[in-house]
């Protein structure tokens, strides 16, 4: 299936990174994956069974952030072999790996053949420790409430409307240039949230509980993987 570029689609100046930097000295790396997960609403996430695929990776560090598309049906992808060689180094580095809903992202990364080293941190888990009575723990809601920031969804939604597709469930069909800014924001906001939350954890005396919760994440992923 291939989408024709709609004459009504908004203009986008976004392009994927021209080169992939050396992140070996980074202490924290935020990661978000964009996926094709066709049966998530009926069968749950597809990563334990390989039902779907990652179409792109958003990576954010203190000094660099970008979206790296590899399998968008609409085009604009980077060479997957080159990207995978770089990602292997990133994922296997000792840096803390920060995600929002880490079981999903880390699960898909595992399904894609990578090993994640370093401490796994989930900002969704930490948010629940800090405030167990919230209505929403979505990345956008948390970012708005704690950071006064939100994701840039306008261009994504306008493009999806022009193509006649669902901006979230069918994001994989779109040209990467319309997904790039949105996906990059996912990773950047996740990193910003963790930088804020890490201070609040110490202030509220929750460090030991947070450590316990985060240490459970790899076990939960293993259990889901093995069924």
Model-derived regions: residue spans:
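Active-site-proximal helix-loop-helix substrate-binding element of RNase H-like nuclease domains
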Residues: 2-12, 52-55, 59-202, 220-221
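Extended, well-ordered alpha-helical scaffold/bundle regions in very large, multi-domain proteins
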Residues: 208-227
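Short consensus segments that form the blades of beta-propeller domains
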Residues: 45-50
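N-terminal accessory regions of nucleic-acid-interacting proteins
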Residues: 1-41, 83
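Residues at beta-strand starts and edge strands
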Residues: 27-29, 53, 217
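Sparse, context-dependent recognition of short Cys/His-centered cofactor- or disulfide-binding micro-motifs
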Residues: 42-44, 94, 167, 208, ...
């Amino acid at each position: 299936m291939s989408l024709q570029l709609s004459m009504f689609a908004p203009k986008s100046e976004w392009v994927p990174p021209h080169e992939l930097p050396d992140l070996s000295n980074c202490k924290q790396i935020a990661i978000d994956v964009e996926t094709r997960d066709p049966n998530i609403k009926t069968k749950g996430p597809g990563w334990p069974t390989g039902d779907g695929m990652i179409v792109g990776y958003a990576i954010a560090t203190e000094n660099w952030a970008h979206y790296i598309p590899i399998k968008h049906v609409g085009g604009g992808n980077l060479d997957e072999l080159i990207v995978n060689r770089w990602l292997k180094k990133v994922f296997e580095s000792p840096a803390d790996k920060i995600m929002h809903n880490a079981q999903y992202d880390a699960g898909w990364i595992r399904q894609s053949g990578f090993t994640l080293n370093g401490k796994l941190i989930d900002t969704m888990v930490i948010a629940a420790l800090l405030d167990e009575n919230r209505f929403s723990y979505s990345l956008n809601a948390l970012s708005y409430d704690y950071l006064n920031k939100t994701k840039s969804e306008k261009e994504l939604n306008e493009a999806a409307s022009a193509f006649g597709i669902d901006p979230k469930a069918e994001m994989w069909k779109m040209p990467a240039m319309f997904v790039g800014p949105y996906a990059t924001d996912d990773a950047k906001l996740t990193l910003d949230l963790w930088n804020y939350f890490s201070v609040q954890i110490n202030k509220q005396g929750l460090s030991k509980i947070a450590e316990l919760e985060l240490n459970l994440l790899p076990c939960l992923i293993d259990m889901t993987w093995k069924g």
